[in-house]
């Protein structure tokens, strides 16, 4: 007689997490390896944790790409890298006025956090000053929380951004340490961890996540979540690879919608109190199951991404309302 495999009690695991019992790496791998028919049970369990810590609130974030392309790094997934042949817009820094205008557009889109992003390995001191000028005006004229993503930072730059009023700094780990050399050769995994730590030491809330679907194993996928727990990232963007034509990862098989849901649920189980954001690839990879993702995640980007299009803000507002959730405005 064929032995029937007993399914996991996902709800019990969720209640254990709510009672502050940490799950194991084996538990995380079990979520990722669960049969696709269990995904709704897993998402229901993830929602127990999500609701316990965040209720029905959804945080909206908006990106402005203040400097596009022209990056000397060779990250294989990125359309802005020096080795990319993707047909993207390339431009130097936007003016401070344009950056400030973007902040007011973020408010119109009901975003609470405004993310100032620039391509490149690391900013010069002059470029940091350029951002600081815009940040100060935004702080004086809005209640927005400000996140910056400018590349590697030194201690002085991190301190000056903190003093200017930057609330959060994004620097993703991107992939597992074991997989990093296959993705990028111009800097190391440890370089990325170092910048996250410098931002945190300066008093800036650390935002760090990963891009899933870049050849990492299931075990590595789970270990990424625990590494983000270790570095104590307050906000965790879960990106799903969009295999952009003209990049080295063109043709890479993208994750299925169900695989993406399992990643989001696993990340919620491992990092129960953290902001989990469905980020790049949301519309392309999750497709029609986007709303289900919010049963694990509590944050999304509204509008376009760096070089790929998002959906209309009204579609995101409607999705949140249809779920019975609420937009948390002006919240970090």
Curated annotation (Swiss-Prot):
GO terms for biological process: biotin biosynthetic process. Pathway: Cofactor biosynthesis; biotin biosynthesis; biotin from 7,8-diaminononanoate: step 2/2. [4Fe-4S] cluster binds at residues 71, 75, 78. Homodimer. Its cofactor is [4Fe-4S] cluster; [2Fe-2S] cluster. [2Fe-2S] cluster binds at residues 115, 147, 207, 277. Binds 1 [4Fe-4S] cluster. The cluster is coordinated with 3 cysteines and an exchangeable S-adenosyl-L-methionine. The keyword Transferase applies. It catalyses: (4R,5S)-dethiobiotin + (sulfur carrier)-SH + 2 reduced [2Fe-2S]-[ferredoxin] + 2 S-adenosyl-L-methionine = (sulfur carrier)-H + biotin + 2 5'-deoxyadenosine + 2 L-methionine + 2 oxidized [2Fe-2S]-[ferredoxin]. Residues 53-282 form the Radical SAM core domain. The lineage of its organism: Bacteria, Bacillati, Bacillota, Bacilli, Bacillales. Its EC number is 2.8.1.6. One of its GO terms (molecular function) is 2 iron, 2 sulfur cluster binding. HAMAP family: BioB. Pfam families: BATS, Radical_SAM. This is Biotin synthase. Belongs to the radical SAM superfamily. Biotin synthase family.
